[in-house]
Amino acid sequence: MSNGDQHAQPQDIWRETVNEGERRLTREPRGLAATGLVGGLDVMLGLTAVIVLTGAVATITNPELAHVVGSLAFGIALVFVVIGRSELFTENFLVPVGAVYSGRGSRTALARMWSLTLLSNLVGLAIVAAILSIDGVVPQGALDAAGELAKTIEDRNLAAALGSAVIAGLVMTLFTWVALAVGSDGARIALALLIGFLLLGPSLNHAVVSFGEMLIAAFSGTTDMGVAEIAFKEVTAIVGNLAGGLGFVTATRVVQVRGESG
């Protein structure tokens, strides 16, 4: 936590969650849009590192191992997010929800925050994806690696896509909770690097990250997914992320805090 307590109690983490949630919910729309846009840019920088490293490693080993190695690089995106204080749509399944639950924010403000953050995240992704697709900006092997990431998303049936999205929502919301609990930037950086690998290693279906993967592949012509299919995959990711984040983390933390406070 911000006071440097390395052994913060759940009630302390919840108190900080609610305070931060109230602050986020009262920001002006342009502030929400700006932090969301930067969050999208941060994710794409991490994905750029992933596809470049994966493409390079794929020239000397099998694609599966290349993907695992490349996934190690994605954590830098979450480092940018948590240290630079940009925001991702899935970060807001705990903090502002806690404020609304505690009576210190409205559902309307929460809906506004979710929609603006997600939209600006996606705009940030699209900007960088368009640049990466320009011939010569990154090696062709990197674009091919993006195509493989998109193929993983494309090949999942609905049950697998939803299940993967639920886990992604759980992981990101748990990341938010633990990041509030730790007392130093160094610990947050280490946590971000670990969570980044946990997201990319199994190619979890994350509404922002997966959309970025599909956009790079679509803009560069390394996938045959069309607009309708990409949109359906995105909606599936959003639904699963919400279920995992709200249902498995936020709800259980509320029960935990209420139980321990008597």
Where is each model-derived feature located?
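Alpha-helical transmembrane segments and their helix-helix packing motifs
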Residues: 1-262
